[in-house]
Swiss-Prot record:
InterPro entries per record: Aminotrans_II_pyridoxalP_BS, Aminotransferase_I/II_large, AON_synthase_class-II, AONS_Archaea/Proteobacteria, AONS_Proteobacteria, PyrdxlP-dep_Trfase, PyrdxlP-dep_Trfase_major, PyrdxlP-dep_Trfase_small
GO molecular function, one term: 8-amino-7-oxononanoate synthase activity
Name of the encoding gene: bioF
Residues recorded with modification N6-(pyridoxal phosphate)lysine: K236
Catalytic activity: 6-carboxyhexanoyl-[ACP] + L-alanine + H(+) = (8S)-8-amino-7-oxononanoate + holo-[ACP] + CO2
Transmembrane segments: none
Name of this protein: 8-amino-7-oxononanoate synthase
Enzyme Commission number(s) from the entry: 2.3.1.47
Organism of origin: Pectobacterium atrosepticum (strain SCRI 1043 / ATCC BAA-672) (Erwinia carotovora subsp. atroseptica)
Residues at which substrate binds: R21, H133, T350
Length: 385
């Protein structure tokens, strides 16, 4: 089979499976409203949980940073791309989250890949929650270490793996809040197993940081644990983009020497670091926004009465509605969009086969009438489809 034949066959199969992904440009889609063409939709697909993506202080910080530093970093942080703005943000994050060091990355995907790739050796083991993010599972699978997946959020399943002898080191990886199911990892139980078996714990808290815990310090803070490696990302509650790895001093120095994704990538613009520093302040002072988000979550869950679909047991901003078949999920998504409600369908391979879903995300910017409109449209869809 030629390259062209292989590519065409893969595309045809995706279309046959109702799993073909299509990007659609818009004129603004991070906030309460999504604008596409001449239509304005209530937006229930954005990860801008606290509504900070248009915050004037953050926008102003980016503008001022661009005026001072320019719009590009000019290179890797090991060459010219590490400015006072980057250093200040790293120190700010480390102090806030209670770690000796923080290292900035251009994305959460890059941070996860870099950490696993730099640490894992052939004699090592990586035990990952079965529903961990693709960046974690892919990095582990591509590493020389042995990858095993434990049952989702089940510490006893992890324990069974940890009890098997090994000559190498063991890294346990999980998410704080899971991106497709919206549930929270039992972090104290996982950490207890790690400590009992001399393993390290790595937590990707992309969907918990900014939302959970005192001042939005995240899932680990809320559950009173401190993993060896904490990954936080800035494309959700912070309203920007990028990521950071929180760790010890020796680990940070190790990553500066061996994390190829860090060494060989152009660093984020200094203006972005300025914006993120302002975003950290907004997150820390965002108690009212977190309260509003919690009220919206409670309102949605209390009002949901759609018996044809399964609403996952999630107390987070992510409210997955399990539909099952890909075609049915697409039909429901399109019906909602026809009614002016923008929700996205998640299908395999992003989620397990047979569990296609609408991934509804709530934000602090949503108003009660928005939630009620969503509930009404879902109720009518149950009777129509």
């Amino acid at each position: 089979m030629s390259w062209q034949q292989r590519i065409e066959a893969a595309l045809v199969q995706r279309q046959h499976d109702d799993a073909y992904r299509v990007r659609q440009s818009n004129q603004g889609g991070s906030g309460r409203w999504l604008i596409q063409g001449d239509r304005c939709y209530l937006n229930f697909s954005s990860n801008d949980y606290l509504g900070l993506s248009h915050h004037p202080e953050i926008v102003r910080a980016w503008q001022q940073g661009a005026e001072q530093y320019g719009i590009g970093s000019g290179g890797s942080g090991h060459v010219t791309g590490y400015t006072d703005a980057h250093a200040s943000l790293e120190n700010q994050l480390a102090d806030w989250l209670g770690y000796p060091r923080a290292l900035l990355f251009i994305s959460g995907y890059a941070a996860n890949q870099a950490v696993v790739a730099a640490l894992a050796q052939a004699e090592d083991r990586i035990f990952a929650d079965k529903l961990s993010h693709a960046s974690l599972l892919e990095a582990a699978a591509q590493s020389p270490a042995t990858l095993r997946r434990f049952k989702h959020n089940q510490a006893d399943s992890l324990q069974a793996l940890l009890e098997k002898p090994t000559d190498g080191q063991t890294l346990v990886v999980t998410e704080g809040v899971f991106s497709m199911d919206g549930d929270t990892a039992p972090l104290p139980a996982l950490q207890a197993q790690c400590r009992a078996h001399d393993a390290w714990l790595m937590v990707d808290d992309a969907h918990g940081i900014g939302v959970l815990g005192d001042e939005g310090r995240g899932s680990c803070w809320q559950q009173d644990i401190k993993p060896e490696l904490l990954i936080v990302t800035f494309g959700k509650a912070f309203g920007v983009s990028g990521a950071a790895v929180l760790c010890t001093e020796p680990l940070a120095e190790y990553f500066l020497q061996f994390a190829r994704h860090l060494i060989y990538s152009t660093s984020m613009p200094a203006a972005q670091a300025c914006a993120l520093s302002a975003a950290v302040n907004c997150v820390r002072q965002g108690g009212a926004r977190r309260d509003a988000l919690r009220r919206n979550i409670a309102l949605f869950r209390a009002g949901f009465s759609n018996s044809s679909y399964q609403l996952m047991n999630s107390q987070s901003a992510i409210q997955p509605l399990i539909v099952g078949e890909n075609a049915r999920a697409l039909a429901l998504m399109n019906h909602l969009r026809e009614q002016g409600v923008w929700v996205s369908a998640m299908r395999p391979p992003t989620v397990p086969p047979g569990s296609a879903r609408l991934r509804i995300t709530l934000t602090a910017e949503h108003q009660p009438e928005d939630i009620n409109r969503l509930l009404t449209v879902l109720h009518h869809a149950d009777r129509k489809l």
